[in-house]
Amino acid sequence: MPHQQMLILFGLLPVATNISTWWNFGSMLLACSSMQVLTGFFLAVHYTANINLAFSSIVHITRDVPYGWMMQNLHAIGASMFFICIYIHIARGLYYGSYLNKKTWLSGTTLLIMLMATAXXXXXXXXXXXXXXXXXXXXXXXXXXXXXXXXXXXXXXXXXXXXXXXXXXXXXXXXILPFGIISLSSLHIMLLHEDGSSNPLGTNSDIDKIPFHPYHTYKDLLMLSLMVLTLLMTVSFLPDIFNDPDNFSKANPLVTPQHIKPEWYFLFAYGILRSVPNKLGGALALAMSIMILLTTPFTHTSTIRSMTFRPIMQLMFWTLVATFVVITWAATKPVEPPFTMISQVASTMYFLFFITNPITGLVENKIMKYN
């Protein structure tokens, strides 16, 4: 019977005994994804993709639709949770050398790009003051790319300005991309289970494995319940913590908000974009900031997989984390003397981590050889 085979497949899946809590974020991402699709469905049912009605339809959802306020807040804060989990998930992969599962890592990076595309499209759907400016900026950045891009932008967003067609296109994109994410996630999991997970020691764990159920199911459930608790507490008590005051006024193409800044989870990429004075160069740096993750499996030169036993690499990694935080912070600030310099230095350091990655590995190999 197929369902029994499935139960055996997942229940008796052999997993290393020593994987830590950093390995729980994958299942949390799956839960986030499911929740976003469900809440998004209920929001889309009541949403109107028209430039004149979009903002009013969202006000209608939060005020008149039963539990609409809850759907909207769960969807918005759920997206923040999604990004917190995915950034931790990626940091875990970098730290413990999980990127050496090449197929899994490449499919995961593609997933990240799709997730960012979905989140960006959802921002434009609200047609609030910050959203119109963000959509215009995104269209302008895309148009900067090449000669052909202007036509591509017109095809995707229907017009250069954020008109009714653009809202409809964004709503449709935000509706279909999550299904792509779900399909790719299943591929990601299948590719992962070809080789199995890594572990904190970065060693082969074939000699010491336990069944996924009940051990890791309950372990996953613990972190999942903590995440749900955090989510519900935030939705209940601080629903606008990640929100921008500009989102409470309707989009007006004639009035630009004082500080156009995206959601916190894009600030890091936005900071890198802003730190390059050239328009095309900025768009390129923005794309590269994500694409550079694809290089890690090919630039790993160390004989050791995990950073647990690589002190120099640990220093580099935590510098990278600090750099990420600094870029995120600097991107919230206006474009003025101290902040521009901070952004540029931090962005350079971000890219330097990936560039010096192979050299650090070779240096560590040499040091180990002499000891």
Swiss-Prot record:
Heme b b562 binds at H75, X174. It is found in: Mitochondrion inner membrane. GO terms for molecular function: metal ion binding; ubiquinol-cytochrome-c reductase activity. Keywords: Electron transport, Heme, Iron, Membrane, Metal-binding, Mitochondrion, Mitochondrion inner membrane, Respiratory chain, Transmembrane, Transmembrane helix, Transport, Ubiquinone. PROSITE patterns: CYTB_CTER (PS51003), CYTB_NTER (PS51002). It comes from the Eukaryota. GO terms for biological process: mitochondrial electron transport, ubiquinol to cytochrome c. The keyword Ion transport does not apply. The cytochrome bc1 complex contains 3 respiratory subunits (MT-CYB, CYC1 and UQCRFS1), 2 core proteins (UQCRC1 and UQCRC2) and probably 6 low-molecular weight proteins. Belongs to the cytochrome b family. This is Cytochrome b. It comes from Eryx jaculus.
